[in-house]
């Protein structure tokens, strides 16, 4: 009993020495700490977003094998963009890159972009090819991407000027060759007959896959082509050298290639928004606006959802690899802590000008963060 009384006296003495406790003050201190923590988290996320955007710019140039962003003005883009059905279809299908992360898979992408469609505009050849004393259209230089992929389709697109009366048009595509003994300078590729009605001009496509494959096998045989589209009166309706008001009506080649799909594996993670108070590793939304960055050379998409990872990775949280937690338990001082990083990324499709003013439609791997985790 005496021991109990002694303990009570000691406890009361300690309370008196410590002085009165202000519960409101403790509550305010706790609230300030919480606010400071949230503020620090917001600042950290903002810095992470800025770093992510800069990293995306570097990755795009690297994956497209570009040392610098192509310097193409908006006026030049208006002149170079073909006003043709295949390009319009590619542009029309673009919205902000859709967020499709529900499958929970992790794509094993290669680093560099994989090309799906290449639109090649005519250019000047290394030599001046002339027939009957006049330069002939057209000569096409091909990207190295075409040579190392399987060509599944190659279309030559030509624009035919409008006619005033109904007429039949005879279209002829000729391949220029080295002069033969009999003086022949070209050989036929395709011929077709079209019926045109008065009104607007039309785009016509011609299959040139076989010719393209031959050119890729024997590049020295690529001397260019000649395009003719004669009406019943002998007038050439094909736009080969665009005149005033004919910007975007140049002939061009549309080449499609294919790539082998890759396997995937399963993974999961947390999703948050900018107002989230989640402290753990989480995926946050981030939209990259190429127009705001001044990258007019990217035709589409003008913006896409890139997302980013941010948050803490304590060892009590689920690790990407089971051995990570085991190693830390065995040697907690010798192992570095895990980082919040993407565990699932997906590609984006992009339509853009390369450094040679060719229009490329390709797939760039690992540009969208779909899942985040600690590893």
UniProtKB/Swiss-Prot annotation:
Keywords: Cleavage on pair of basic residues, Cytokine, Disulfide bond, Glycoprotein, Growth factor, Heparin-binding, Secreted, Signal. The keyword DNA-binding does not apply. GO terms for biological process: myoblast migration involved in skeletal muscle regeneration; negative regulation of myoblast proliferation; negative regulation of satellite cell differentiation; negative regulation of skeletal muscle satellite cell proliferation; positive regulation of lamellipodium assembly; positive regulation of macrophage chemotaxis. Its main location: secreted. Glycans are attached at residue 71. GO terms for cellular component: extracellular space. Synthesized as large precursor molecule that undergoes proteolytic cleavage to generate an N-terminal propeptide and a disulfide linked C-terminal dimer, which is the biologically active molecule. The circulating form consists of a latent complex of the C-terminal dimer and other proteins, including its propeptide, which maintain the C-terminal dimer in a latent, inactive state. Ligand activation requires additional cleavage of the prodomain by a tolloid-like metalloproteinase. InterPro entries: Cystine-knot_cytokine (IPR029034), TGF-b_C (IPR001839), TGF-b_propeptide (IPR001111), TGF-beta-rel (IPR015615), TGFb_CS (IPR017948). The keyword Signal applies. It is found in: Secreted. Residues 1-23 form the signal peptide. The record marks 98-99 as: Cleavage. Belongs to the TGF-beta family. Homodimer; disulfide-linked. Interacts with WFIKKN2, leading to inhibit its activity. Interacts with FSTL3. Acts specifically as a negative regulator of skeletal muscle growth. This is Growth/differentiation factor 8. The lineage of its organism: Eukaryota, Metazoa, Chordata, Craniata, Vertebrata.
């Amino acid at each position: 009993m005496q021991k109990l009384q002694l303990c009570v006296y000691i406890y009361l003495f300690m309370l008196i020495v410590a002085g009165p406790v202000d519960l409101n003050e403790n509550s305010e201190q706790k609230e300030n700490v919480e606010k400071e923590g949230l503020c620090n988290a917001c600042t950290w996320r903002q810095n992470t977003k800025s770093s992510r955007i800069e990293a995306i710019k570097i990755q795009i140039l690297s994956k497209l094998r570009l040392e610098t962003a192509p310097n193409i003005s908006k006026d030049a883009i208006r002149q170079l963009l073909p006003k043709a059905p295949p390009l319009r279809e590619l542009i029309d299908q673009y919205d902000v890159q859709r967020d499709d992360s529900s499958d929970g898979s992790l794509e094993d992408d290669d680093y560099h972009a994989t090309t799906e469609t290449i639109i090649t505009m005519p250019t000047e050849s290394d030599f001046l090819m002339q027939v009957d004393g006049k330069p002939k259209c057209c000569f096409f230089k091909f990207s190295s991407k075409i040579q190392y992929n399987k060509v599944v389709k190659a279309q030559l697109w030509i624009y035919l000027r409008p006619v005033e009366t109904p007429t039949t048009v005879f279209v002829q595509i000729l391949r220029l060759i080295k002069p033969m003994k009999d003086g022949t300078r070209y050989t036929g590729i395709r011929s077709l007959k079209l019926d045109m009605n008065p009104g607007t001009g039309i785009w016509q496509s011609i299959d040139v896959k076989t010719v393209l494959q031959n050119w890729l096998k024997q590049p020295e045989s690529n001397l260019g082509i000649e395009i003719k589209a004669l009406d019943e009166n002998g007038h050439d309706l094909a736009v080969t050298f665009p005149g005033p008001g004919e910007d975007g009506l140049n002939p061009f080649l549309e080449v499609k290639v294919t790539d082998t799909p890759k396997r995937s594996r399963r993974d999961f993670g947390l999703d948050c928004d900018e107002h989230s108070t989640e402290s753990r590793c989480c995926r946050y939304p981030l939209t990259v606006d190429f127009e705001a960055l001044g990258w007019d050379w990217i035709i589409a998409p003008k913006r896409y959802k890139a997302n980013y990872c941010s948050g803490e990775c304590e060892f009590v949280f689920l690790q990407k690899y089971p051995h990570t937690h085991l190693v830390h338990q065995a040697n907690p001082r010798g192992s570095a802590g895990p980082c919040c990083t993407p565990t699932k990324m997906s590609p984006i499709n992009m339509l853009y000008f390369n450094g040679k003013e060719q229009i490329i439609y390709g797939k760039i791997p690992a540009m969208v963060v779909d899942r985040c985790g600690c590893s």
